[in-house]
Amino acid sequence: MKLKLTLLSLCYILLSYSQDYKPNNTSVKSNNTNFTAITNAKIHISDDKIIENGTLLIQDGVVIKSGKEINIPKNCVVIDARGKFLYPSFIDVFSSFGVKKPNRLSSSNRSPQYEPLREGYYWNDHIRPEQNALNYFEFDKKKARELLSLGFGVVNTHLNDGIVRGSGSLIALSLKGTNSERIISKKSGQYLSFERSIQTNQAYPTSIMGSMALLRQLYHDALWYKKGNIKNTDLAIEAFNTNSNLTQIISAGSRENAIRADKIGDQFNIQYVI
């Protein structure tokens, strides 16, 4: 497996709104399934593909077609964008947008803490795969405006704490609407790092080599657990195994650590996004 580093992706913001099932007591509600066509625009499909005087066809917030010769359906809302440019938005694939980092756990105990504080979870509290970004998420309009002004339309946000940090969520930076309308994917990837969690004072690991050893041990334990060889329930390992089908995103922190992370991926046949 070759070392692969992540580049920021470009894509159109596809905001799909699900069927409205909540009562609306403030106004008369009507479902609009009409098409919207943005015409005569200069559409940047990619860095080397540009459509002059192009048309972008949208239905229910989703881009259906783009091109020069697009058949515009009847009853379509047409917006003339002559002289305007349409660009895909950036996606911040490694973000903590709207997810406040937890407070550092204080302790008056001067002796080292070797045991975990949590029961029913992994033996090391720096492993926290059960965390999900949505459980800590609060939309930040001010920060969203800043990101939108820089060309970002979507963020892949997560709780930036721990060696295994849990699952992130893909969020559209829409200033209007609610979080239920902004959520593109509730679980968009599993996040990892070599950094200790500030939510615990557990002594181990104390070094980068210790973090690597702990991560390797977790993979062995997770496989052993998956085979049914551990009778006790471990909520952290169960979450880790559940998240194993997600994209695995690891924060290495340096070029040397990126190589180290890739070697761990080689060992367990995992392609990290680094």
Describe the residue ranges of each PLM region:
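Bacterial Sec-dependent N-terminal signal peptides
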Residues: 1-22
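Histidine-rich, glycine-flanked metal-binding segment
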Residues: 21-23, 28, 43, 47-89
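Polyanionic/metal-chelating signatures
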Residues: 140-143, 148-271
